[in-house]
Swiss-Prot record:
Pfam families: Toxin_3 (PF00537). Residues 1-19 form the signal peptide. Belongs to the long (4 C-C) scorpion toxin superfamily. Sodium channel inhibitor family. Beta toxins bind voltage-independently at site-4 of sodium channels (Nav) and shift the voltage of activation toward more negative potentials thereby affecting sodium channel activation and promoting spontaneous and repetitive firing. BmKAs1 also significantly stimulates the binding of [3H]-ryanodine to ryanodine receptors on the sarcoplasmic reticulum of the skeletal muscle. It also displays antinociceptive effect in rat models. Toxin BmP09 (which may be post-translationally modified) specifically and reversibly blocks large conductance calcium-dependent and voltage-dependent potassium channels (BK) but has no effect on sodium channels. Its main location: secreted. A possible sulfoxide Met-85 on BmP09 could explain the difference of function between BmK AS-1 and BmP09. Residues 20-82 form the LCN-type CS-alpha/beta domain. Keywords: Disulfide bond, Ion channel impairing toxin, Neurotoxin, Potassium channel impairing toxin, Secreted, Signal, Toxin, Voltage-gated sodium channel impairing toxin. Has the structural arrangement of an alpha-helix connected to antiparallel beta-sheets by disulfide bonds (CS-alpha/beta). InterPro entries: LCN-type_CS_alpha_beta_dom, Scorpion_toxin-like, Scorpion_toxin-like_sf, Scorpion_toxinL, Scorpion_toxinL/defensin. This is Beta-toxin BmKAs1. Expressed by the venom gland. GO terms for molecular function: potassium channel regulator activity; sodium channel inhibitor activity; toxin activity.
Amino acid sequence: MKIIIFLIVCSFVLIGVKADNGYLLNKYTGCKIWCVINNESCNSECKLRRGNYGYCYFWKLACYCEGAPKSELWAYETNKCNGKM
């Protein structure tokens, strides 16, 4: 039984089950999903995108998501927003 559990854990490491943290990406505009103080909408949007927990990061006015796949997150390197909303 211990060997089976060990093999399962090793397979997760080899497969690369990885979740990241970051700002949610609006795939239509390429921008971050904006918010003001609405943690509930950010949390639901984060969970819809397979994240664990989301909240409105007030200083950046954008939804921050913890535990989401990288494909659902905005990245500075691939930023295509150019100020569009």
